[in-house]
């Protein structure tokens, strides 16, 4: 009996392989208001046309597979397939294209960032026909975003809880991040909060290690918070990292934080996972806890310009999954972050309606339809000389977080906190008087040094510290 090479048992079905572009490249398609739209930076293998590469992305991230299958006839591919509807070359980059793909809303489970990412980026990034692939942006339609609860509280509710208005909030990551005992850790928290900071913070990898178990840390940090509050009359907080090896353990830690009466907990949302993050966010909403989000592992995913997922996509996903703060880079510190790109995704975190603006990397107009905003956290290699630039770049609805820039003060932790608070108050006052922080920042800080010896000492220590490297990820020429 000869081998079967073609099946003719069903009218209209023919086994075999055909080009993706015959089905999934549809330049005539008009996008719907309910479609999820994606902008991919595609680098095809030599000899692969951009239309075929874009169609392959649309197919492999929706209904397609490498060959025609029988069961295509049991559903409506026109209803469910992703469509590559537009392709444009990237200026100044050889063999790179921005491919726009539209996905029908029915492809995605309601309220699940996990399912959304599994569909759109779960499998296609290993496709052999592509040399590299990067998800640059997503347009989340209101029809889908309304299935998410979003941040537990949002910017305005946080300000009301803390009773702090008209300025950025100040934070500090306790250093060294690993190795301190719980009591010494709590002591450092107290000194920083007593000196004038609003928050102190667990670093991303502080969980429950042999040198400091989580329950001991929570208790000593709570004691530090209450003592500092009593002495300053200000509401204080410490980001207690609830991230754990299981969701059950994470929720147990969050519940203990609630029992202690502290205002905020923390989660590493990329290493912990979106399912865990959404669960924790819902718990925080129901129990009055603010939720600080660390983006540990993000640069593994987002730093390379031609492959991965841009952070603006991860930021949108976090806003849907839930978090009241998220780290966003500093522009001026030690970590990667070009100014216009950073401001683009900061707007996507905070604002209700964001217009398309390719000069800042925003590929689609995004309407969050009143979903609460997320406060961006500037953290990483910043000190008092950066305060004018940070205040000017990030504005009031931000957290400026100085770890080494507080604990590295030559006189100790509390004077380091005083220096940062004085620098911030001076910058806010100067801005409110109409002065140009970008141009007059150094003069403003020097003037404040005359009546703050703590600030003067900090300025002397860090006067020559700069992190001047060209960013890897930059805006495309348009």
Curated annotation (Swiss-Prot):
> Active site annotated at which positions?
175, 294
Name of the featured protein: Ribulose bisphosphate carboxylase large chain
Traced from the root, the source organism's taxonomic lineage reads: Eukaryota, Viridiplantae, Streptophyta, Embryophyta, Tracheophyta
Class of enzymatic activity (EC top level):
lyase
The propeptide segment or segments lie at 1-2
Residues bearing PTM N-acetylproline: 3
Q: Which GO terms describe its biological process?
A: photorespiration; reductive pentose-phosphate cycle
Q: What keywords does the record list, in alphabetical order? A: Acetylation, Calvin cycle, Carbon dioxide fixation, Chloroplast, Disulfide bond, Lyase, Magnesium, Metal-binding, Methylation, Monooxygenase, Oxidoreductase, Photorespiration, Photosynthesis, Plastid
Binding annotation for Mg(2+):
201, 203-204
S-adenosyl-L-methionine among the record's keywords? no
This entry's comment on the bound cofactor is:
Binds 1 Mg(2+) ion per subunit.
Q: According to the UniProt entry, which residues carry N6-carboxylysine?
A: 201
Q: Which GO terms describe its cellular component?
A: chloroplast
Q: Which organism is it from?
A: Neurachne munroi
The similarity comment for this entry is: Belongs to the RuBisCO large chain family. Type I subfamily.
């Amino acid at each position: 009996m000869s081998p079967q090479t073609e099946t003719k048992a069903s009218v209209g079905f023919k086994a075999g392989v055909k080009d993706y572009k015959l089905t999934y490249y549809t330049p005539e398609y008009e996008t719907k208001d309910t479609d999820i739209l994606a902008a991919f930076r595609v680098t095809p293998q030599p000899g692969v046309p951009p239309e075929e590469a874009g169609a392959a992305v649309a197919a492999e991230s929706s209904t397609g597979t490498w060959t025609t299958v029988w069961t295509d006839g049991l559903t409506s591919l026109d209803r469910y397939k992703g469509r590559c509807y537009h392709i444009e070359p990237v200026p100044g980059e050889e063999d790179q294209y921005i491919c726009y793909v539209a996905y029908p809303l029915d492809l995605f489970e309601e309220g699940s960032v996990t399912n959304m990412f599994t569909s759109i980026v779960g499998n296609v990034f290993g496709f052999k026909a592509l040399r590299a692939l990067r998800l640059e942006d997503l347009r989340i339609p209101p029809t889908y975003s309304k299935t998410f609860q979003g941040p537990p509280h949002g910017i305005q509710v946080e300000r009301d809880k803390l009773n702090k208005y008209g300025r950025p909030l100040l934070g500090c990551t306790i250093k060294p991040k690993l190795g301190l005992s719980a009591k010494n850790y709590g002591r450092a928290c107290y000194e920083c909060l007593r000196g004038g900071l609003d928050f102190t913070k667990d670093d991303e990898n502080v969980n429950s290690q042999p040198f400091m178990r989580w329950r001991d840390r929570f208790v000593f940090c709570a004691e530090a918070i209450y003592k500092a509050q009593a002495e300053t009359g200000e509401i204080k907080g410490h980001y207690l990292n609830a991230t754990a090896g299981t969701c059950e353990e994470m929720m147990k830690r969050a519940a203990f934080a609630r029992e202690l009466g502290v205002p905020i907990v923390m989660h590493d949302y990329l290493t912990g996972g979106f399912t865990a993050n959404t669960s924790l966010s819902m718990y925080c909403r129901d129990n009055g806890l603010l939720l600080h989000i660390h983006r540990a592992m993000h640069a593994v995913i987002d730093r390379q310009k031609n492959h991965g997922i841009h952070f603006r996509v991860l930021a949108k996903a976090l806003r849907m999954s839930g978090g009241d703060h998220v780290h966003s880079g500093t522009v001026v510190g030690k970590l990667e972050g070009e100014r216009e790109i950073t401001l683009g995704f900061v707007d996507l975190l905070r604002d209700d309606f964001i217009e398309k603006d390719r000069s800042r990397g925003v590929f689609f107009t995004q309407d969050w339809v009143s979903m609460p905003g997320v406060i961006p956290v500037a953290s990483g290699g910043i000190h008092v000389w950066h305060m004018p630039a940070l205040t000017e770049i990030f504005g009031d609805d931000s957290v400026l977080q100085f770890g080494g820039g507080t604990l590295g003060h030559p006189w100790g932790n509390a004077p380091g906190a005083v220096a940062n608070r004085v620098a911030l108050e001076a910058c806010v006052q100067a801005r409110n008087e109409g002065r140009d922080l970008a141009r007059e920042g150094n003069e403003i800080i020097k003037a404040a040094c005359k009546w703050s010896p703590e600030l003067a000492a900090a300025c002397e220590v860090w006067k020559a510290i700069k992190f001047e490297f060209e960013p890897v990820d930059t805006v495309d020429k348009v």
